[in-house]
């Protein structure tokens, strides 16, 4: 889980190590740069429509379709606001995580022959 640059790192590390993480939560990410992808943890992404720090058009509105095309289960929420995490979005993300609404495709250790 992360916000802003922390969300970018959460996406990058969570997708690279999807065999270790059951879920990824990214609040207002700027990019994702996974080295390689293992597993398919479900992903929660949110972004403010008035974000001037990491504009939604250049960030989440590009990231989410890439995740969809790659076969990830994504819950995406846009909200009317700036570069922040509204309480309602944080609560929704925590509910999503704690209720196991997303079921991760996690590889068991050793499945890849390593």
Where are the predicted features?
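Active-site-proximal beta-strand/loop segments in catalytic clefts of secreted hydrolases
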Residues: 1-5, 27-30, 46-50, 78-82
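C-terminal catalytic histidine-bearing segment of alpha/beta-hydrolase fold enzymes
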Residues: 46, 52, 57-114
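Short, proline-enriched alpha-helix->beta-strand connector loops that line the catalytic pocket
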Residues: 38-43, 72
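Tryptophan-centric aromatic hotspots in well-structured domains and transmembrane helices
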Residues: 21, 44-47
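Primarily recognizes the serine-hydrolase "nucleophile elbow" in alpha/beta-hydrolase
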Residues: 1-40
């Amino acid at each position: 889980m992360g916000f802003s640059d922390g969300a970018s790192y959460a996406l990058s590390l969570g997708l690279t190590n999807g065999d270790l993480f059951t879920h990824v939560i990214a609040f207002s990410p700027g990019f994702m740069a996974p080295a390689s992808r293992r597993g398919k943890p479900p992903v929660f992404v949110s972004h403010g429509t008035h974000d001037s720090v990491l504009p939604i058009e250049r960030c989440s509105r590009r990231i989410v379709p890439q995740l969809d095309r790659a076969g990830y289960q994504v819950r995406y929420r846009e909200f009317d606001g700036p570069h922040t995490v509204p309480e309602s979005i944080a609560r929704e993300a925590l509910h999503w995580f704690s209720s196991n609404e997303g079921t991760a495709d996690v590889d068991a250790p050793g499945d890849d022959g390593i």
